Amino acid sequence: MKNLFFNKLQKKMGYLFHNNIILKQALTHRSFSSKNNERLEFLGDSILNYIISDALYNNFTNIPEGKLSQMRSYLVRGNTLAEIAREFCLGDYLILGIGEVKTGGKNRDSILSNAMEAIIGGIFLDSNINKTHEIVISWYKNRLYSMSLKNLKKDPKTRLQEYLQGNKFSLPQYYIKNITGESHNQEFTICCFIDDLKKSVIGYGKTRRKAEQSAAKQALLLFNIL
């Protein structure tokens, strides 16, 4: 039953592990066990940076080094990794300690992004660099090839507002759906609703502002304009 459960995640990610022990370790947070995903995260971080650097270098041949670095930072940062994790519903598969479960750890950006890096490290150990490159690029494809240097300087809420205004749609409404965790370590869940389109998306963050930005980014993804 457990293997079938993990198979759903692997299908979403587009990669089937040969060694399920590696996958389980990649999903295990330090709050649950000393045999956790931190070493895999260390490995995956370096591999992710290499893969994204390689993709940017070969696909943006006229962009100078400084701009390439800016683009890479945007793509490998924790918020972006957490968004990809949510596309896979990764939080539902994380192995967390009781304390993290109670405080909403499965929705926390830092835990999700670290797990994504660990999974990348795990795929590398389970296969090879070429296969890992193929899988990671499949996750990043839309983000990678629709990037705009101008838009990198604008936050998601601004970009969403400009897009909606430009298409004569109503402006988005943001409201708090949930708040979890202790007062010093809260996690906000924000709903972004666009009335004209009858569309709503969810964002998460440690502050209301960050959660609103996260929700706006999900809306941009919905419209395929990120």
Curated annotation (Swiss-Prot):
Quaternary context: Homodimer.
Family: Belongs to the ribonuclease III family.
Active site per the UniProt annotation: D45, E117
Entry EC number(s): 3.1.26.3
Organism: Wigglesworthia glossinidia brevipalpis
Segments traversing the membrane: none
UniProt-recorded name of the protein: Ribonuclease 3
PANTHER family in UniProt: RIBONUCLEASE 3, RIBONUCLEASE III
One GO term (biological process): rRNA processing
Highest taxon, organism lineage: Bacteria
Pfam families cross-referenced by the UniProt entry: dsrm, Ribonucleas_3_3
Ranges for domain DRBM: 155-225
Encoding gene, per UniProt annotation: rnc
GO molecular function list: double-stranded RNA binding; metal ion binding; ribonuclease III activity; rRNA binding
Main location: cytoplasm
Limits of the RNase III domain: 6-128
Alphabetical list of NCBIfam families matching this protein: RNaseIII (TIGR02191)
Compartments where located: Cytoplasm
Sorted UniProt keywords: Cytoplasm, Endonuclease, Hydrolase, Magnesium, Metal-binding, mRNA processing, Nuclease, RNA-binding, rRNA processing, rRNA-binding, tRNA processing
